[in-house]
Amino acid sequence: MINDISDIAYRIEEISDTRITLVRDAVNRTFRNGGLLIRCLRPTLSIDYAFSAAPNDYIRRFLSCPALARLVPELQPMTPLPNDLTIVPLGRYTLEGEIVQLLLANGMYADSEFDVRMAPSAATNFVDALIGDSKSSVHRVDSHWADWFDGIEWNSITLIVYTDRKWWLICAFDTD
């Protein structure tokens, strides 16, 4: 059982599932001065985390690991992370709601392409593509932890999904 994940090597998996790219592309067209960043990172070694024992600790270590800064350099994670980093556990349906909110949100200079009937269906499909029927852990980070967000906490979100030995990192923001 691995307890320290800060020095583990990861690889980014290509995201080609249209249920994911549909949401990513739609939000990117709406959030023109920010965007939606989605990355799937998998450890290069076959390891077993004790994730359920201390998820907040693992998330902090994941967000501050050197591999994340190398693989997703546009994020520019803060080092060290703020001590007051707020990590909130979510359920699957709350994750779907967060995605619905992203799809319905108007950007600073562009309106959403989705309406209240289309967005929930797209969000359900998105979450199905991420986690399917597998056991997963879903969290939202409610604090500024990376410079990519331009210090904007009022119009940004970070969602982290750990499932099937991989990390999904979903970050969005928009500004004027």
Predicted regions and their residues:
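Acidic, proline/glycine-rich low-complexity IDRs
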Residues: 120-176
